[in-house]
């Protein structure tokens, strides 16, 4: 049986945050880039915002979670996904990646990143 799948996403959301395992990272902070993608079966194509994922809400979730200092980026991603599926229970799949620009390590590293995905058991 064929069905439509819809994607609503944010790419390259730039944030400054205090995430990091080392105490100095939580003092100095760093620049981060977030990508957030949701996928779901659309309920209808009737031009109603209530029947889709509002990317403004996704941005609010990302901005709010980036303000909550965490040691591990994985924790930030898990919190973002949890809020997305709580707000939009019809979402089948969520993927979030979080890049830390210029991570504090020897050498020249453009960014490190962590990616986490959730798939509904529906």
PLM feature spans:
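N-terminal, polar/charged subdomain of small-to-medium soluble alpha/beta proteins
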Residues: 1-122
């Amino acid at each position: 049986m064929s069905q439509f799948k819809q994607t609503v996403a944010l790419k390259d959301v730039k944030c400054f945050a205090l995430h990091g395992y080392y105490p100095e990272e939580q003092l100095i902070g760093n620049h981060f880039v977030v990508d957030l993608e949701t996928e779901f079966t659309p309920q209808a194509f009737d031009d109603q915002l209530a029947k889709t994922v509002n990317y403004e809400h996704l941005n609010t979730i990302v901005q709010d979670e980036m303000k909550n200092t965490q040691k591990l980026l994985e924790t930030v991603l898990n919190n973002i996904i949890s809020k997305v599926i709580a707000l939009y229970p019809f979402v089948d799949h969520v993927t979030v990646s979080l890049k830390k620009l210029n991570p504090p390590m020897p050498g020249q590293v453009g960014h490190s990143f962590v990616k986490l995905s959730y798939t509904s058991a529906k």
